[in-house]
Amino acid sequence: MFSQQQQQQLQQQQQQLQQLQQQQLQQQQLQQQQLLQLQQLLQQSPPQAPLPMAVSRGLPPQQPQQPLLNLQGTNSASLLNGSMLQRALLLQQLQGLDQFAMPPATYDTAGLTMPTATLGNLRGYGMASPGLAAPSLTPPQLATPNLQQFFPQATRQSLLGPPPVGVPMNPSQFNLSGRNPQKQARTSSSTTPNRKDSSSQTMPVEDKSDPPEGSEEAAEPRMDTPEDQDLPPCPEDIAKEKRTPAPEPEPCEASELPAKRLRSSEEPTEKEPPGQLQVKAQPQARMTVPKQTQTPDLLPEALEAQVLPRFQPRVLQVQAQVQSQTQPRIPSTDTQVQPKLQKQAQTQTSPEHLVLQQKQVQPQLQQEAEPQKQVQPQVQPQAHSQGPRQVQLQQEAEPLKQVQPQVQPQAHSQPPRQVQLQLQKQVQTQTYPQVHTQAQPSVQPQEHPPAQVSVQPPEQTHEQPHTQPQVSLLAPEQTPVVVHVCGLEMPPDAVEAGGGMEKTLPEPVGTQVSMEEIQNESACGLDVGECENRAREMPGVWGAGGSLKVTILQSSDSRAFSTVPLTPVPRPSDSVSSTPAATSTPSKQALQFFCYICKASCSSQQEFQDHMSEPQHQQRLGEIQHMSQACLLSLLPVPRDVLETEDEEPPPRRWCNTCQLYYMGDLIQHRRTQDHKIAKQSLRPFCTVCNRYFKTPRKFVEHVKSQGHKDKAKELKSLEKEIAGQDEDHFITVDAVGCFEGDEEEEEDDEDEEEIEVEEELCKQVRSRDISREEWKGSETYSPNTAYGVDFLVPVMGYICRICHKFYHSNSGAQLSHCKSLGHFENLQKYKAAKNPSPTTRPVSRRCAINARNALTALFTSSGRPPSQPNTQDKTPSKVTARPSQPPLPRRSTRLKT
């Protein structure tokens, strides 16, 4: 699975690389413009032998057409002055160190491939004169739009931008095979430093012998490792750099990612003539050196090219001395010191605790730089990074001093102010050797005994995890700076000793670079002190979760970059234990991400993002949001009417005797409702003979006893006797004794309603008569599905058909079937034929029955006594005709049934 993932990642990287290649054409125009500016600046500076720089972006070898950066070693000052170094560093840090996580590709270690992006976009440009005034390149110019062009294997995160401080870098990037802790620091911690070195500090190739200035031997360095490859040959010192690929042991390569292998394998294939150093903008250059920690025994000791970039007239003189890669590193004293210096020069980004040591060593460095010019300033930065190793390096620097008398005058030539600035910068980046600007171009003979070299890495492991090379290129206003860059490769023993340290430093994956501060400082030209302060303020961790601090010191013509790896903190995924580095560095420098919702702290941005996506965090966040919304709702104004209605008690309920229900609100409004009117009308007795409503049953009874009613009743009887004999069935005799006690009260309540109700009743009577006539006419033919004459069924605990003279129980359900029968239909037709002379009499008789029923119901309700059994002897006939069939109210129907 892991190999498949690596292959997928490699494929993705290749796809991204192809996209970037397409975008290169667009960027070439911008770079050409920058080149013009640089050429103008170079022309302004004293004419030096131009160093043709063909820079190939860190693209795969499919693009050989891209010129490689060939730094012809000449006495002229190196093209890479402080300003160019600044741009290179800026670009490196803009792109993030994780971009430089180059696969430890199998480099021949003779091809010095370095990402040219670090050269400040000096691609395919022949740099005429190294003496460059500080180019007024705004940070946007420095930042290449498509970073992955130069770093095809850079992760997407690195391309998107450096992660926030404290984000762990890919540990694999720091595990550089076949390198000293210094070189690993060079390569891993900085392909950026290598790029710096290549651009400004052409990484010195270890010279088997210390050739004098401009000597051909120096010009024939065998690029020991891709680091050396990263080092463009400096003038004079490196007339030609032989690129004899020394295959690094495959075990280390096998351990490394296939993507890195591909990158490394591709780049060594591209080899320029030995006289030309390939500076390929491939982050692999750093990775190319086999990891000493992983397989120190298997790894041949790569030769170290000692490059002494000297800005005497702003000329970088690089002594490229070739040591056979297979040759166990016999680091001469110079070689040992120089690798240290290289490491320091490249990026001796030592943790802050090392910075303290640097501060302690700073006075030493100043003294050495001035009184002991013999000691190369590189020794001091190493001493800072290496602690006890400082003394050894300084002592070694003394033989160097002898071998390099030129260095001393150079250091003297540098004004103390510059030294102080350099020291400050060294505190930041600990690139003390570079800090001392050496006026005289001198080739530092590499005479340091190998023993010192081997000792250095182990000590560095303790003091400075992987002695992260710190590169501070301080080009003072006019004093040339001599940058001693020595690719110090330790023998396997030394590698083993320093292996722990190397392991401690994982490769920076997207190392955080405070580019904003760098850009601001470069644009505004902050003081050195401010830059240092700012650099110190920036907490970060080199390697896993470390951030590469880059500060640009801009004074007059030159800028100084200081890259200080802050407290290296191992990532949990990092197999290499970087505990000593973490313990040595102050914990306060590690940036902590804190979640105030969950009260949890995270050591890296990735961990913090993972925490943010956890369901527990989301749940708590939702709870907080809910609470906040509830608080907001509680603060919203509430309408007064709502508050008043809440405070008020519900209105009392009142009983309506007419409707037999409770009602809310005003009595008058209730009486005006349609339901109340219907109930009241149904309860009022109605005389169907006289067509009169009575407010109370008492008045109705009195009316029935009156003579006028009796006369009209006799007339109606005479008419009905002709049709059917027994009209008495329609009359109900009720004992009315005591039924009229509560009538007076009801009369008073109903007086105000009587006028309106009488009018409404008259209209209804007329309407009902019309409807009855229509029904009378409509039932001419029989249909078995139609119920005819339903009105003639009168409920008397059952149903009696007055036409057929049949009775049906209420629960029998036969009333409807009877109405559908043919006999009932024939009888109905006979009845209608008999009623035709006076069709109005039928509704009258029907209403009488219904109204009588209603009157009795009202009497029983008002009196509160159960209805007495109908007494046939008391026949107080109140003949009531049936009303039109309307579904009776449930209340009345239930009472009648019961």
Curated annotation (Swiss-Prot):
Compositional bias annotation for Low complexity: 318-327, 355-383, 402-435, 572-584
Gene3D superfamilies hit by this protein: Classic Zinc Finger
Matrin-type Zn finger ranges: 799-830
Presence of keyword Phosphoprotein: yes
One GO process term, biological-process aspect: positive regulation of DNA-templated DNA replication initiation
Biased composition (Basic and acidic residues): 263-273
Outcome when changing residue 672 to M: Found in patients with adult onset primary cervical dystonia; likely pathogenic
Disulfide bonds: none
UniProt-recorded name of the protein: Cip1-interacting zinc finger protein
Location in or out of the cell: Nucleus
SUPFAM superfamilies: beta-beta-alpha zinc fingers (SSF57667)
Organism: Homo sapiens (Human)
Residues of the signal peptide: none
UniProt KW Oxidoreductase keyword: no
Composition bias, Polar residues: 170-203, 328-351, 384-395, 436-445, 859-879
GO annotations of cellular component type: nucleoplasm; nucleus; plasma membrane
Listed InterPro entries: CIZ1 (IPR026811), Matrin/U1-C_Znf_C2H2 (IPR000690), Matrin/U1-like-C_Znf_C2H2 (IPR003604), Znf-C2H2_CIZ1 (IPR056345), Znf_C2H2_jaz (IPR022755), Znf_C2H2_sf (IPR036236), Znf_C2H2_type (IPR013087)
Function field: May regulate the subcellular localization of CIP/WAF1.
Modified residues (Phosphothreonine): 244, 567
MF terms in GO: cyclin binding; nucleic acid binding; zinc ion binding
Noted disease: Defects in CIZ1 may be a cause of adult onset primary cervical dystonia. Dystonia is defined by the presence of sustained involuntary muscle contractions, often leading to abnormal postures. Cervical dystonia or spasmodic torticollis, the most common form of focal dystonia, is characterized by involuntary contractions of the neck muscles, which produce abnormal posturing of the head upon the trunk.
Sites bearing Phosphoserine, chain numbering: 209, 350, 547, 821, 838
Assigned keywords, A-Z: Disease variant, Dystonia, Isopeptide bond, Metal-binding, Nucleus, Phosphoprotein, Ubl conjugation, Zinc, Zinc-finger
UniProt region (Disordered), positions on chain: 48-69, 157-305, 318-471, 562-584, 859-898
Glycyl lysine isopeptide (Lys-Gly) (interchain with G-Cter in SUMO2) crosslink site(s): 280, 340, 401, 549, 588, 680, 705, 830, 879
Subunit structure: Interacts with CIP/WAF1.
